[in-house]
Amino acid sequence: MATSSFSIIKVECWPVDIPLTDPFVVATGTRLVAENVFVRVTLSSGAQGYGEAAPFPEVDGENRESCLGALRQLGKAILDRSAADYEGIGRLLSELAPTQPAARCGLETACIDAYCHGLHIPMWKLWGGADVRNRETDITIPICSLDKTLELAREWYGRGFRLFKMKIGIDVGEDVRRLQAVHQALPDIAFIGDGNQGFSRDECLAFVDGVKRFDGTLALLEQPVAREDLESLAAIRRDTGIPVAADESVRSLEDAKQIIAHGAADYVNIKIMKTGVVEAREIAAYTLSSGLKLMIGGMVETRIAMGCSFSLVLGMKGFEILDLDTPLLLAEDPVSGGFEYQGAWLSPWKLPGLDLFAQPPNNVTVIQRH
């Protein structure tokens, strides 16, 4: 057992409800409220760190109750371990809860944040600090009516956003009409079409043809078809000439290897909620070494989880497309400190860890030695 100042002596977790400004509708489900879990880890030195579990049941099968249940068990498993061994902790959590990546992610993030506080360094410095600069994110527009799509597009355009991630995948004709309306209103923007597995191969090809007919700029197709249909992903790349990003298809390092072996994508979308932080870094490094490109996104997250993802961008090289926008879709911000948004741009922070604080409620779950 670790006896250093980095020894984990307490884990706390509590549920948080954060309403969204507008319904978050994608091909696989709808969110009105982010039902997440915050985690806080305390070390023997007194250093504390925060993490967040942001399950999206339609995507990963996890929900808040399953996350809380997993965290109660996983928290016990890491008591007295050294947060300095965050890689070993990540591997242990993967072995103990292979089907609970969001819960693991929340606990991993809190351990790493606490460790960085103990070292008095920003989290991005732990990953090398190779690319510390302001970075631009896209903005997500959910599946909604034509009028609402235009309203949101004009609002975000006015706030400085120029890359619009359009949720698609339910109705090809309606998807094309929505993009065309935005293109006509705001001709200098570019699109990411995010299908969330909603299309068949033929539907995706029809969608791309429709966008090409009105000369829309389609920068990327993200996960247009089912996660296991690597053949169609490869065919869509070949037949459209549009870069393809694998999202739901990559939930592990082994998945990333399969994507690369099948020539199924140009980009891999890194999400710490799919894999935990340690494996996300491994996937990112492998992707780059294999000649593919990186984007990074998230579930419906606050600036805790999104800050951890941004730390990877700042610490490692190679993240070309940032989809780190969901805190902007929330009606309130339950955390203080940390990175800041300036329009479409994310600004790094300089203080230790994630430089974030969240106030626990009275009904927090506490895991510690008695």
Language-model regions: role of each:
Residues 133-148, 168-169, 200-201, 245:
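Active-site mouth loops of central-metabolism enzymes
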Residues 156-164:
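Catalytic domains of carbohydrate-active enzymes, especially glycoside hydrolases
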Residues 166-305, 331-341:
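Catalytic core of soluble alpha/beta enzymes
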Residues 8, 39, 46, 107, ...:
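Conserved, mostly hydrophobic/aromatic
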Residues 109-141, 148:
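Glycine-rich, aromatic-flanked loop segments that form ligand/cofactor-binding clefts
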Residues 3-20, 36, 300-370:
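Flexible C-terminal active-site loop/helix
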Residues 10, 42-118:
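Metal- or metallocofactor-binding catalytic centers and their adjacent structured scaffolds
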Residues 2-48, 53-59, 332:
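Structured beta-strand/loop patches that form or line metal/cofactor-binding pockets in enzymes
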